[in-house]
Amino acid sequence: MYLQGFGNYHHSEAVKGALPTNQNSPQHCSLGLYAEQLSGTSFTRPRHNNLRSWLYRILPTVTQGTYYPYEFNVMQPFVDELSPNAMRWSPLYNSSQIKCDFVEGLFHIAGSPLVNTYTYYCNHSMSDKYFANNDGELLFVPYAGEIHLHTEFGKLILSSGSIAVIPRGVKFKVEVISKEAKGYLCENSGNPLTLPQLGPIGANGLANPRHFQYPVAAFENSGGEHTIICKNQKKLWFTVCNHSPLNVVAWHGNYAPYCYDLSLFNTINTVSFDHPDPSIFTVLTSESEIPGVSNLDFVIFPPRWMVAEHTFRPPYFHRNYMNELMGLVYGEYDAKKEGFIPGGISIHNCMTPHGPDYESYEIAASQDLKPNYINSLAFMFETKDYWQVTEQAYRHPSRQMDYLNCWQGFKIEFSQ
């Protein structure tokens, strides 16, 4: 069961009577609860941008105790000098017999001043272990397995073909439902993700607000040792407390985790000729200080019909002002016949040329242009700042050192 609607002002209570009816902070909360506000923006942001929620919890967060440096640091140093070459990786993870939870399975791939990208692998649930990211919100893009995200606001169910966003500062734990789970993770430290403007598309299309789902209140009332791991200023810290931090019995507000089924994306595409720009596939965006230039765009290339006439249908050859990090959830990407599979990653930074490989080009340039259905799901994290690659990703054996060879078959066919 979920609450529906992107950015709506929601309210939910796991126990009847836990929510105050006429105010936020009563002198004495019902059921012996404590009122606590969680702010996602400054108090004075314009009303349409203002994000906050009121939580009614068994214990206030201030009881969590002292934080100490954690033994594992998820953030990794970047390569000192990065060439303008295109880069691609095969999937980093194979199945492991070693127990590995969500935090232990994070692998830092690349970052920019306000965005970082990781992959995650987990085959073990976080039972009495919790995570919070004070540095930004987290966008989950799974490609294998099913996980349940137990958050301060309630539970989200997540599997391949769906996404979830955990806001900055919200504590959660990951329960692994399948044998193992794998996915991509994007950390956004800029403006919170929101729906893109639709412009001439009109009032409807792309991701519809009513399809975004928010959790109903659920809580843990358990004692014993509970470990909280917190990412704060690019470092991991931990504390041990004697009560679960997921102790919110009721909440109301517009700052909360949410999930979305990508199959509900209303894809816009040409029904005449040419290939529209990929901005028409934007699901969520984080706006920068420059109008029309995003800090982060989350873009998908979903299952869709291709019907353009007298047109080269795959993505065109391109040198981009923006910086692209791509992944594949399932299927075969229409611009890459080989080498780019689910779990893989490619990075094409500003002005780095990219486009269909030679085999894909040859097929698309000569095929009979009948309506064609593409059953795949690729995505892109696009940012205005260069993707800096971590040393561990740059030197990882899954990096395809021969990636540029996929474009070496092209010949000069010009004739006057």
From Swiss-Prot:
Cofactor (UniProt): Fe cation
The protein's Enzyme Commission number: 1.13.11.5
UniProt keyword annotation of Phosphoprotein present: no
Keyword Oxidoreductase: yes
Binding site for Fe cation: 318, 324, 354
Keywords: Dioxygenase, Iron, Metal-binding, Oxidoreductase, Phenylalanine catabolism, Tyrosine catabolism
Record: residues binding homogentisate: 333, 354
Pfam families to which the protein is assigned, alphabetical: HgmA_C (PF04209), HgmA_N (PF20510)
GO annotation terms (biological process): L-phenylalanine catabolic process; tyrosine catabolic process
Any one of the GO CC terms: cytoplasm
GO molecular function, one term: homogentisate 1,2-dioxygenase activity
Superkingdom to which the source organism belongs: Bacteria
Associated pathway: Amino-acid degradation; L-phenylalanine degradation; acetoacetate and fumarate from L-phenylalanine: step 4/6
Active site: 275 (proton acceptor)
Catalysis: reaction(s): homogentisate + O2 = 4-maleylacetoacetate + H(+)
Family from the record: Belongs to the homogentisate dioxygenase family.
Subunit structure as annotated in this protein's UniProt entry: Hexamer; dimer of trimers.
Known function: Involved in the catabolism of homogentisate (2,5-dihydroxyphenylacetate or 2,5-OH-PhAc), a central intermediate in the degradation of phenylalanine and tyrosine. Catalyzes the oxidative ring cleavage of the aromatic ring of homogentisate to yield maleylacetoacetate.
Stated name of the protein: Homogentisate 1,2-dioxygenase
